């Protein structure tokens, strides 16, 4: 019986590996993913807030009411300038010709700061700034910021941790998924921008 179970388990693993290999091969042949050695792209991707404060807009707040926004932590796959493509739970590639102008964590922090500042009319400081001492602290983990090949979708997921000036800690997960996205830089870049703005808006509303 154990031998039969072992054979079934081995067959299942082989089938999963074959499926992942076929999907990766299809994406590679169609020019959707890159495994390294590619030529530099003609343009770079960035994130742009859908709303921004007008020039001359002034805000003020007591130190305990200001918000110190820290750069989010990211997994190794996101600590680069490339857009990850999730083939399955065990396989990862990078999207061809999709390169960020800055690391995703930096871009998302800047987008989030502008959204919170605009939507909540709050003073937002950069985490680590001496002026931010004693302020409310917002940290987080940007766990997903890329393309899911099995769903043909971009996924942005941010786990926020808020430390209030009263010492109370709150946590919340925010996520945006946009399906039906083609696996190319021209489609994935704008879709990630929309999803990132969606998540940033969710966070801003949570903080109100």
Where are these predicted regions, by residue range?
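Bacterial N-terminal signal peptides that target proteins for export
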Residues: 5-22
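C-terminal motif of bacterial Sec signal peptides marking the signal peptidase cleavage site
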Residues: 28-31
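Surface-exposed short loop/turn segments
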Residues: 33-47, 114, 118-166
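A structural "domain/chain start" motif
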Residues: 33-101
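Envelope-exposed proteins and targeting segments
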Residues: 63-65, 79-81, 88, 96, ...
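Solvent-exposed coil/turn segments that connect beta secondary-structure elements
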Residues: 72-74, 88-90, 143-145, 159-165, ...
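Structured segments of extracytoplasmic/periplasmic soluble domains
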Residues: 75, 110-122, 198, 202-206
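Short secondary-structure boundary motifs at beta->alpha junctions and helix caps
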Residues: 91-99, 167-201, 205
